[in-house]
Amino acid sequence: MVIKVAVIVVFCLLFWAGCYVGTGTDQKNMKGFRSYPIKVQELVRRNEELSKLAPKKVSIPFTILLNIVMFVVIFGIIGVILKFTVGFSSFAEILIYFLIFGEVLNLFDLVVIDLLWWRNTKRIRFSFIPEKQFYQNPKQHVDSFLRGILVFAIVAAVVSTLMFII
């Protein structure tokens, strides 16, 4: 059990490290463009230099599908490693583990990364919008968290089924 909990903790820290490394310049910050408040997105789209880098609008259902596929692959790899090292005793154990894993990651992303770090660090600010107040609206983050609840439930069900079959 300790190893399974450690995997979740390490994954959360790696997830945050990825967010940290993926920010710091205007170009890097464009990767997380949809996480920015709508007002910031509008200002970036009006900026002559950065508007060229702004991603096209992607539908939410498409984004959800991409997230499901990505996390099924990632959690599937982790699941196989755990199954053949520390093991799982039943389908229910696998399902509960990956439900907890996904929802802990989702909550960590909302509280630690988005609300505590992201909204307060200068790393995510665009050079032509340095004022902190532009980045304080949590709506995009909360909406993402709410979608994540469903995404990680689906991921847990799919991964559990695959792990049970293997």
Task: Give the location of each predicted region.
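Juxtamembrane/disordered regions of integral membrane proteins
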Residues: 1-92, 96-166
